[in-house]
């Protein structure tokens, strides 16, 4: 019995959840610092919205699907650089994060086990004068032990 208690305590310590948003350590590769194994199956989530935007316009997108507790989204150019700025639409459930630039990442805020999300809407503003393809990459956390890293994507053409 004592061994089971020690094992349970060790497992509880090794899995960290970030209910107040993704940590800056996740900026580079969008990997949560949960200490659990990531999923390689097709994620039950998608990013929906227009597939093109002018460089002087704001783009509104929605991450949706099955229930989830956390997320982290970046827009990346063809050279895998994080580009553009996010604007929060739902300030109860999302916040921006400064990874390589101001407001260049959006993540969850105040995730609670009993109150999962099924969707989150956000705005993105392209860099001034930018033209080309941008890939939105999302990590979605279903539970502390179940998450998909960068597998939820959407391609956008910026004109």
Curated annotation (Swiss-Prot):
Organism: Drosophila melanogaster (Fruit fly)
Keywords tagged on the record: Antibiotic, Antimicrobial, Disulfide bond, Immunity, Innate immunity, Secreted, Signal
UniProt signal peptide: 1-17
Gene Ontology CC, one term: membrane
Upper lineage: Eukaryota, Metazoa, Ecdysozoa, Arthropoda, Hexapoda
Xref: Pfam families: Reeler
Family listed: Belongs to the insect defense protein family.
Record localization: Secreted
Occurrences of domain Reelin (ranges): 18-159
Protein name per its UniProtKB record: Defense protein l(2)34Fc
Keyword Secreted set for record: yes
